[in-house]
Amino acid sequence: MNAKTLPFDDSIEAETWHVPLFIRGRLTLQRVLSGMGGWKLDPKDVPLIIRLVENPKYDIGLFAGNVSLFSHDCIHVLLGRGLLTKDEAFVIGFTMGSTKKMFRWRKNLFMFCAKYLYPECYRFGEEERLVFNIALEAGKRCSADLSKFDFKKYKNYSLDGLRSKLKIDKNFLRHCYEFEKKCFPKSVESQRLI
């Protein structure tokens, strides 16, 4: 990555793609999403077990916070997260927490699925489980249920404007990310957060 390349430009590989939470400038949601290059996941490429757990088309009432892949990508951007496993754990946890419907039995069932049923590269280990739990609590502070929000109507909003509309508190997220960074000093995704 050269000095002029942003960490979310389309020349960046998926493993290093992320949107810093405190990036300067007036970036729109659409601008950042367009930086997800040719590696962007197609909905049909998502493993079936993940679709059953996380996709609203397969909602069987077991889990809260099911969102489309587009909405999921938007939430990655708004939370300043990349695409690695701890990033996924935070985005999923925050989304589920925002519903205010993630009761203990749902959380435990999701954790079982994420630890034992997800394909290996998507599985949550103990570190990801902690990140998920932090995010679940952080998501409860969000005034909007992100699983019900129509992100397509807000593609041209600035990131800060959309965070403000959804009452996503960047300073609270900073505290969550500082804690995560201290907990996982060898984790690439945790170290690049702040």
Name every feature range the model reports, one short phrase each.
Residues 138-194:
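Long, solvent-exposed, polar/charged low-complexity segments
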Residues 5-160:
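Core of folded catalytic or high-affinity ligand/protein-binding domains
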